[in-house]
Amino acid sequence: MWRFFARRYSLPCPTWLGWLVELDNPFTTINRAATIVQHLELAQGMSVVDVGCGPGRVTIPVACAVGQTGEVVALDIQAGMLQQTHEKARAANLTNITFLESGIGEKKLRHNKFDRALLVTVLGEIPNQEAALKEIFDVLKPGGMLSVTEIIFDPHFQRRSTVRKLAGAVGFREKKTFGSCIAYTLNLEKPV
C-alpha cells in the first residue's frame, strides 16, 4: 500500500517499514552501507550530515569512520526513525551523533559546517528538492561533498540525469559516479 502511494506522492518510508531499509539488496552492492562509506573518503574529525537518516543504516558506520573527534548529524522528519538510530548508537557506544527531527530545507543547519552530506534513497521523498539541495550546498564547507545514492527498486528513484541537473543548478560539480543504471552513488562537490 505504501509503495503504491509513495510512487504518486513524496511520502517517506514509514517507521514500521524501517526494517526493510536494513536489508541488503541481492541484485546490487552499491547501496550497502560499507560501500557508501567507502566512497565518502571520510577521515577522523570530519563533520557529516545524514539527511533522511532513517533507522541509521549508514549513520552508524559513518559515525565510526569519523571517530570521536568527528561529528554526525542524523536528520529525519520521523521521530520513530531517529529513535531507532539513537538505540543503535547507544548499543555501539557512539557519542558523536546529534539527532535532529527536521526536514531539509527548514534552515536548521549551520552555514559552512559539514565536510560531507548524505542523501541515501531519500531525494525523491523530498517535496522541494531544489530548496533541499540549496540548503545542503549552503551547509557544506567549500570543497565539501554531497553523496547521493539511488536504487531503482525504491519507489522514489531519481535518475542520474535528474540529480545532475538539480545539483548543477545550485552550484554542485560532479566529482565521481559509482554503480550502474539500476543503482548508483553520485558524489558532488561544492567548489572551493
Predicted segments with their positions:
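Class I SAM-dependent methyltransferase SAM/SAH-binding core
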Residues: 49-51, 55-106
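Conserved beta-strand signature within the Rossmann-like core of class I S-adenosyl-L-methionine
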Residues: 143-150
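Conserved alpha-helix/loop element of class I SAM-dependent methyltransferases that forms part
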Residues: 27-46
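A short glycine-rich, Lys/Arg-flanked "PGG" loop and its adjoining helix->strand segment in the class I
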Residues: 130-142
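Class I SAM-dependent methyltransferase Rossmann-like catalytic core
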Residues: 14-30
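Core SAM-dependent methyltransferase catalytic element
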Residues: 170, 179-192
